[in-house]
Amino acid sequence: MAALKDQLIVNLLKEEQVPQNKITVVGVGAVGMACAISILMKDLADELALVDVIEDKLKGEMMDLQHGSLFLKTPKIVSSKDYSVTANSKLVIITAGARQQEGESRLNLVQRNVNIFKFIIPNVVKYSPQCKLLIVSNPVDILTYVAWKISGFPKNRVIGSGCNLDSARFRYLMGERLGVHPLSCHGWVLGEHGDSSVPVWSGVNVAGVSLKSLNPQLGTDADKEQWKDVHKQVVDSAYEVIKLKGYTSWAIGLSVADLAESIMKNLRRVHPISTMIKGLYGIKEDVFLSVPCILGQNGISDVVKVTLTPDEEARLKKSADTLWGIQKELQF
């Protein structure tokens, strides 16, 4: 008696199952899973692989997503602590690492996470030598540098999520003040993801109308409306969310899926993301900071040259010096 499947279905060809648009997420904590669900909801991959060291949690997260397959259009969701499961990925997103504690600066995390990266990155490279690496773990700018050094990849293929979220927070808060959707509020936060990020007030606009042309004091202490508080809120917001719920996840997950979309669909959108900035703004060291980058299928193909005020440029340089001070002490 033939099996039910054979009675029902006539096979016409033996297919080789090589994924065309595979994405891997390393780390299935709150951030990794927020990235995973956001990517699944945007239909960006034909295969999603999850990797972590905690096997029970990993299998549970995979099964939970698989059980939603009817409502998704990603036909294959897999997981393992063995990196062979990640083979042939177009994009590998690293969210693994020690979690930021309440009140802990992102920079304080660094050596703990370098040691984790020394294991992860060579394994990723072994199975997907042509992938783009998207680093999300904090401190993201330093760890993007670490991933670049360990991987041996060209700099266009090693991307830090950087200030994509900082800029999104900035545009949300700006929109709240003005009663306008964040998509129509334009403004860029550049530099270090975190405490020393730089808001570029000269470029802040709605419908091409520069806010600085209406309020020349914008972003300064002399501003009666204290718009610089908007940037202060951006810097403080992660700490506040961590204090309230213990971690951040949803916004960073959505932000990462936004970057993944630009890469997987070769959109060539401009994002404030972390890239090797040596040679720009008088920076002479191998540091990664966020500047507006054109993002597509090859990763970061171009950088947009932003005109900064002398003060903004000085702040960017100071960030670079701070990061280099830490990077040159790293053991790897």
UniProtKB/Swiss-Prot annotation:
Binding residues for substrate: R106, N138, R169, T248
Enzyme Commission number(s) from the entry: 1.1.1.27
Chain positions found as N6-succinyllysine: K5, K118, K318
Modified residues (Phosphotyrosine): Y239
PTM-bearing positions, type N-acetylalanine: A2
Modification Phosphoserine occurs at: S213
GO biological process: cellular response to phorbol 13-acetate 12-myristate; glucose catabolic process to lactate via pyruvate; lactate metabolic process; liver development; NAD metabolic process; positive regulation of apoptotic process; pyruvate catabolic process; pyruvate metabolic process
Pathway: Fermentation; pyruvate fermentation to lactate; (S)-lactate from pyruvate: step 1/1
Pfam families the record matches: Ldh_1_C, Ldh_1_N
PTM remark: ISGylated.
Similarity section: Belongs to the LDH/MDH superfamily. LDH family.
Name the record gives this protein: L-lactate dehydrogenase A chain
Annotated source species: Rattus norvegicus (Rat)
